[in-house]
């Protein structure tokens, strides 16, 4: 290409960038990216470009498109890592492990199970890209989860993405529960409990169960402490305790009995830009894949029908 043509091409790109409005339509974003409009629609249909539909028309926020370009470029901004914090989940843990094995050294996907509220604090400080959370029954998740996010000033930049519904209840040592048992019996002095940290979704769940059955939390005998769902299940499996709040999947993973008490939503909070990051899209693909869906059946207590759907925006 001659210097004259190179100069003209550079001038066209620079002019497109300068003239682009804050919210672009299909024609404008095609001009901005120097691609045809059919390619824009293809990117939208594949969920690969930041876009929103308003009154039947697609709009493309220029700031998010710019970030998407940086993150989609080879070796681009932060394309090689994604950090997940917050609530623990066996299936999400397996998906992260599978993805890390597939990526080898090309990228880093990490998962720190530190509880719902601490996870949101870490997300707000930008020490994590994604926060996994659960906070009460599925029927109230669209009120409770956004309310948690609104406790942070950064919530205006966040969205909530549904991973799945999980069956919540009590994880029990084998043989502890029989057909004629009652929840009240689990609060007798001889039954040993795993304590969870404040701010954990499972601890919140336990408080509601205690209130519903008009029990006294002081009656519990605590012999172990856990900071994640799987740690609590491990404490029971290794004989340190008899009961802990948790999901069916964690109980199944560690060979425990399970007392079902309801379903909850398990969501991911993140900025809009992260949702379109290549690594995050890859994580959703792994969760939809045959191996993770097989594991969901093995563990039990999962409903993955809404996986990847955006359920709330600020």
Residue locations for each model-derived region?
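Polyanion-binding surface elements
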Residues: 2-37
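Flexible hinge/capping segments at coil-to-helix
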Residues: 163, 172-193
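Periplasmic-binding protein-like
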Residues: 22, 154-169, 252, 256-285, ...
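A short, Lys/Arg-enriched interface patch at domain edges and termini
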Residues: 65-88, 96
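Short helix-start
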Residues: 26, 50-72
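N-terminal segment of the mature folded domain
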Residues: 77-78, 94-172, 176
């Amino acid at each position: 290409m001659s210097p004259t043509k190179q100069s003209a091409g550079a001038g066209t790109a620079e002019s497109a960038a300068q003239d682009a409005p804050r919210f672009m339509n299909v024609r404008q974003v095609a001009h901005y990216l120097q691609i045809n409009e059919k390619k824009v629609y293809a990117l939208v249909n594949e969920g690969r470009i930041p876009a929103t539909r308003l009154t039947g028309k697609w709009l493309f926020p220029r700031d998010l498109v710019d970030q998407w370009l940086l993150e989609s470029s080879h070796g681009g901004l932060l394309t090689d890592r994604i950090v997940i914090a917050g609530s623990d989940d066996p299936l999400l843990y397996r998906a992260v492990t599978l993805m890390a094995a597939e990526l080898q050294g090309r990228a880093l996907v990490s998962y720190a199970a530190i509880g719902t509220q601490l996870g949101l604090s870490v997300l707000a400080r930008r020490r994590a890209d994604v926060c996994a959370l659960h906070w009460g029954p599925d029927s109230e998740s669209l009120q409770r989860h956004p309310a948690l996010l609104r406790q942070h000033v950064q919530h205006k930049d966040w969205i909530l993405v549904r991973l799945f519904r999980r069956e919540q209840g009590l994880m029990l040592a084998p043989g502890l529960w029989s057909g004629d048992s009652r929840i009240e019996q689990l609060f007798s002095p001889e039954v040993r409990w795993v304590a969870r940290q404040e701010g954990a979704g499972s601890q919140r769940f336990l408080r509601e169960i205690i209130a519903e059955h008009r029990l006294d939390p002081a009656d519990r005998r605590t012999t172990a402490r856990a900071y994640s769902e799987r740690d609590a299940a491990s404490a029971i499996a290794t004989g340190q305790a008899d009961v802990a709040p948790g999901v069916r999947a964690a109980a199944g993973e560690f060979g425990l009995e399970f007392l079902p008490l309801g379903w909850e939503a398990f969501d991911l909070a993140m900025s809009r830009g992260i949702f379109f990051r290549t690594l995050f899209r890859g994580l959703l693909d792994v969760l939809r894949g045959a191996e993770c869906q097989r594991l969901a059946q093995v563990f039990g207590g999962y409903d993955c029908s809404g996986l990847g759907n955006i359920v709330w925006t600020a």
